[in-house]
Amino acid sequence: MVWCCRPLLRKYGNFIDNLRIYVKGGAGGMGLPRLGGQGGKGGDVKLVAKKEVTLKKIKDKFPHKRFIGGVGGNSSVRALKGQPGEVCQVEVPSGIVITTEHGVKIGELDKEGDEIRVARGGQGGVFQTDFLPSKGQKRIIHLDLKLISDVGLVGFPNAGKSSLLSRISHAKPQVAEYAFTTVKPELGRIMYPDYKQISVADLPGLIEGAHYNRGMGHKFLKHIERTRQLLFVVDVAGFQLSASTLYRSAFETVLLLTLELQLYKQELLDKPALLAVNKMDLPNANEKFEELLKQLENPAGNFHLLPDELVPERPIEFKHIIPVSAATGQGLENLIGCIRKTMDEQADMEIRELAQERLQSLQKETSRTVKRNLKNSPQRTHH
């Protein structure tokens, strides 16, 4: 069954997925030596994940990108213990990875309500410090957003990902006949006749060695982590980044893309995946597509086409392999239908797994309750 879709236009022209900010905890308050009074602690700086917050909104609202905790209150005759400084809470989107200026990971905020302290307030003045307060912690941190979408497009540059996205969703990514057209994530949304919506993300193209952070490297791969399934897009005629790089066939391209995902994070290979073989309007495309299908039926038998170090530990098993042409529209309705089918299957599986987890949890709780009741029940004595 082929699903037709009514595209929904949604623009993300000024989308940003990383932000550099300055954070500083508030200084502590002065102690009171003659009465032994303690100064108040300086306010911390915390990040809190909230819905409908974007990095762009933060940048627009706080152009100086400086966040400072409140100063702790001084000790006084009326209040020997100074008031703590006000905590500076910065609302950020969920799916944020926080790192230091030197790339050291501080933590992640994956869901709404998660929070993390990124700068500690200074201690108030006490006897041990001659009643002198300490300054708050200060540093520059980076906020990196891992984009959430249902489907993430995976491919080398110029495979036609942007053209494909524009045809199935009416998003408006930049499209041209040269590599690295996409330098920022583009989001499109497919709307089906029953009003089901599926979001699709076109992400910057990979190159060999992306897991080492070459090219767009980690800027691309971090977003793949938060997609529910993968849509590989390969050129049926193969791929060559430049005259100085090796030509790769469509099959070799699939293996290399798999390897990049594996080396970045093995779990990415467990995501449901589809394969769109693009540019089927080219000469001899059908013969090349049939050759690719045969190679994918027995991937291990064709590993010799690549050096051992470029062969993934295990090939991805695609749910569907769809020949398409973003230029002519060939196969696009079939692709849209396959995306919907796999998303529905995945949703059904997740519901079953959740129900099974709840059942097991209920059984364990019931078992504990029975044991507790037996233990607490009065023992009968037999005469």
From Swiss-Prot:
Tree of life domain: Eukaryota
**Which coarse location class applies to the principal site listed for this UniProt protein?**
nucleus
The residues covered by the OBG-type G domain are 149-344
- Region listing for Disordered, in residue ranges: 362-383
**UniProt keyword list:** GTP-binding, Nucleotide-binding, Nucleus, Ribosome biogenesis
Every copy of the Obg domain together lies at 13-148
Protein's UniProt keywords contain Protein biosynthesis = no
For whether the record's keyword set contains Ribosomal protein, the answer is no
Choose any GO biological process term that the UniProt entry carries and state it.
ribosome biogenesis
Family (UniProt): Belongs to the TRAFAC class OBG-HflX-like GTPase superfamily. OBG GTPase family.
- The name this protein carries in UniProt is GTP-binding protein 10
Q: Which species expresses this protein natively? A: Xenopus tropicalis
Gene this chain is encoded by:
gtpbp10
